[in-house]
Amino acid sequence: EEGKSAAYYKAAMSGNDRRADGSLIPGDALFVQKISGITQPLEEMCPYVYEHAYSPHLASRIEGHPVEMAVVRDGYRAVCDKYDYVTVEGSGGILCPICFDEAKIQLEDVVSELGLSSILIADAGLGTINSVVLTAEYMKAHHLPLKGIIFNHYHPGDVMEDDNIFMCEYMTGLPTLAKVQDGDTELKMLSSSI
């Protein structure tokens, strides 16, 4: 919406490159900045940035900087206090381990702790039906609200992809919020749908 501020947040991101000074570049956040045009500082976007391209629980253990839920929560609240709209990206799927020490944090714990409603992002291609339905059923069983599905890598008129979308909607009861083609730079979606 015009005149509103937007921001991005992700609890943990792994597989990041280093700058010449040795600091890590939060790659996903940098990509979001470039594509969306938001001016939010990178350091607000993600409290945990790891070099190793592993699940966050393993990257954090190797790098000696485990995720703490309080840090994730406080960072999210600070971003929410500053911006009108905040999009939170998951780290892997809903069952992805974020920390596996005494805390045993999975992505579902982050979603629950932050009180988030979710949008399921799925590939439109082969194999998506099982993945989408299992994720949706798991989230429903654990009382994690889902608003709908966005399908990526969509090819208009592709018989299999169109059927995948139909089957996902039918089997989950969730609406398709958008079909995103490779190279799309705008997402046409009503804010009321999210």
Task: Please report, for each region that a protein language model flagged, where it lies by residue.
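Short, charged beta->alpha transition segments
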Residues: 44, 72-82, 104-109
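Long amphipathic N-terminal alpha/beta scaffold segment
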Residues: 56-58, 82, 86-88
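Short, surface-exposed amphipathic charged segments that create phosphate/polyanion-binding patches used
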Residues: 58-62, 186-194
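Conserved catalytic-core segment of NTP-binding enzymes
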Residues: 85, 90-173
